[in-house]
């Protein structure tokens, strides 16, 4: 008898706990961003107000409650604007941004570095070399150079 | 055994102890870096595993072509790391006898060739000396992609559980078709012209390989540290045993000589 009533209490308890879901536990009005490269996680679930992304279909700004989607990123600048208004800029070499339900944005990219870590002279000399290689007879070298030019030109535009 | 024999034995055990101890120290110093690499690759993988979890992507139950990628490394002396992966891969092959196998690392290659030589289609070596990089993982993924399309790809690796434990686990890698067929994909607004499923499937394979290699590396280093720690302890025990035996034998030899001398001297009286 006692055991039976215990069991029924246990059942009702689990019932009420089961209603509480993960999506309710987080505040959906704050955008949470993770910016990760394979060798380093720059942000993990950091609460920010806006993120600007260099999507391959064009620049896009992401705010909280954005519709879930997946975007391929072109080489360009990811701008993270914190709720205090300070913005930090990172250059990424392309990758993916997935916006998940619950205002969660995760950006995975192969390389990501702060914009002020780049030297404009280095970019110029590397770009000159890549442009020289782009007209190479070897198809692989030419294709690699074309990618290099795409990244370096985006980087040059971002640094200036 | 004679005194000389025990002496050489004792010396060689002492040398072995020095070697295992050094290997243990080397493994300990690498441990920190291996764990950092593993943590960042885990975080990197979360990006797309979150997406797959939300879209509820799953591998097809009945796959015509299955590929198993077994990730381990080239170096031994690290406990049961390689044989555990081989065992797990063999168990998978029991379920799907026609699956193709790609091996990463010489040790797992040797083990798979012994029992399932006809299934192994491609193997890599020279990885796992240092913490894996994205560059290595993408080169491997590129080669694997040249094998053709598979309905189901599974990456077998040693999951790093703690400093003393690891367990063979599986990362699924999804084909573009299974991504498109995900039941909850409609929650996302994907642009049709960008071929997102194809690129996502490619990056998720690279990601799975990178994460598997990083976890495997960390597990291997910690397993090696433990194996070498045990070996050093055992060597220490043997050194103690043999030192006692050596001293006893030396005593016995001296006593024997004394007995000889004294009996000789007393016989002269």
From Swiss-Prot, chain A:
Residues 1-22 form a transit peptide. This is ATP synthase subunit delta, mitochondrial. F-type ATP synthases have 2 components, the catalytic core F(1) and the membrane-embedded component F(0), linked together by a central stalk and a peripheral stalk. The central stalk, also called rotor shaft, is often seen as part of F(1). The peripheral stalk is seen as part of F(0). F(0) contains the membrane channel next to the rotor. F-type ATP synthases form dimers but each monomer functions independently in ATP generation. HAMAP family: ATP_synth_epsil_bac. GO terms for cellular component: mitochondrial inner membrane; proton-transporting ATP synthase complex. Keywords: ATP synthesis, CF(1), Hydrogen ion transport, Ion transport, Membrane, Mitochondrion, Mitochondrion inner membrane, Transit peptide, Transport. Its main location: mitochondrion. The keyword Iron does not apply. InterPro entries: ATP_synth_F1_dsu/esu, ATP_synth_F1_dsu/esu_N, ATPD_C_fung, ATPsynth_dsu/esu_N. It comes from the Eukaryota.
Swiss-Prot record, chain B:
It holds the Pfam family ATP-synt. Keywords: ATP synthesis, CF(1), Hydrogen ion transport, Ion transport, Membrane, Mitochondrion, Mitochondrion inner membrane, Transport. The keyword Transport applies. It is found in: Mitochondrion inner membrane. It comes from the Eukaryota. GO terms for cellular component: mitochondrial inner membrane; proton-transporting ATP synthase complex. GO terms for molecular function: proton-transporting ATP synthase activity, rotational mechanism. The keyword Transferase does not apply. It is a peripheral membrane protein. Mitochondrial membrane ATP synthase (F(1)F(0) ATP synthase or Complex V) produces ATP from ADP in the presence of a proton gradient across the membrane which is generated by electron transport complexes of the respiratory chain. F-type ATP synthases consist of two structural domains, F(1) - containing the extramembraneous catalytic core, and F(0) - containing the membrane proton channel, linked together by a central stalk and a peripheral stalk. Belongs to the ATPase gamma chain family. NCBIfam families: ATPsyn_F1gamma (TIGR01146). F-type ATP synthases have 2 components, the catalytic core F(1) and the membrane-embedded component F(0), linked together by a central stalk and a peripheral stalk. The central stalk, also called rotor shaft, is often seen as part of F(1). The peripheral stalk is seen as part of F(0). F(0) contains the membrane channel next to the rotor. F-type ATP synthases form dimers but each monomer functions independently in ATP generation. This is ATP synthase subunit gamma, mitochondrial. The lineage of its organism: Eukaryota, Fungi, Dikarya, Ascomycota, Saccharomycotina.
